[in-house]
UniProtKB/Swiss-Prot annotation:
Any one Gene Ontology cellular component term annotated for this protein: cytosolic large ribosomal subunit
Lineage of producing organism: Bacteria, Pseudomonadati, Chlamydiota, Chlamydiia, Chlamydiales
Keywords tagged on the record: Ribonucleoprotein, Ribosomal protein
Domain of life of the source: Bacteria
Role played: This protein is one of the early assembly proteins of the 50S ribosomal subunit, although it is not seen to bind rRNA by itself. It is important during the early stages of 50S assembly.
Protein name: Large ribosomal subunit protein uL13
């Protein structure tokens, strides 16, 4: 930690951000937006006392059971994901229900990406996110993940 003489603010160095913890979050029955905002706090490192905006201080997050996330109200029927294929008349629309059946990890990824900063640092922090369909996270046992209840 480096302490400046003229302020009381403590600034973390990039070398201090090397020890990264990993967390496992179960998305079963969780609301999409509330889950996403908690995950973004962990990815950016805002849950730490030594948070510094310009340093990648965040931890890694593994989200399991992505297909069991839900939305409140009528959004389940109204929410539409749009993408462009690159061709003329190539705008495609996929309803939430179809996207949940095909690519449940994309739903959470899309929500979290919208909350992250659109900078090089934000892209680097976003790479610490893993979203899994189902509840098996054995491939991440070597990181010794901590199970979080959000």
């Amino acid at each position: 930690m480096e302490k400046r003489k003229d302020t009381k603010t403590t600034i973390a160095k990039a070398s201090e951000s090397q020890n990264k913890s990993w967390y496992v979050i179960d998305a079963t029955g969780k609301t999409l937006g509330r889950l996403s905002s908690e995950v973004v706090k962990i990815l950016r490192g805002k849950h730490k006392v030594t948070y510094t905006p310009h340093v990648a201080m965040g931890d890694g997050v593994v989200i399991i059971n992505a297909e069991k996330v839900h939305l409140t109200g009528a959004k389940k029927n109204q929410k539409i994901y749009r993408y462009y294929t690159g061709y003329i008349s190539g705008m495609r629309e996929v309803p939430f229900e179809n996207m949940l059946a095909k690519k449940p990890s994309y739903i959470i990824e899309h929500a979290i990406k919208g909350m992250m900063p659109k900078t090089r640092l934000g892209k680097r922090q976003f790479k610490s996110l893993r979203i899994l369909k189902g509840d098996c996270y054995k491939t991440f046992e070597s990181q010794k993940p901590i199970v979080l209840d959000v």
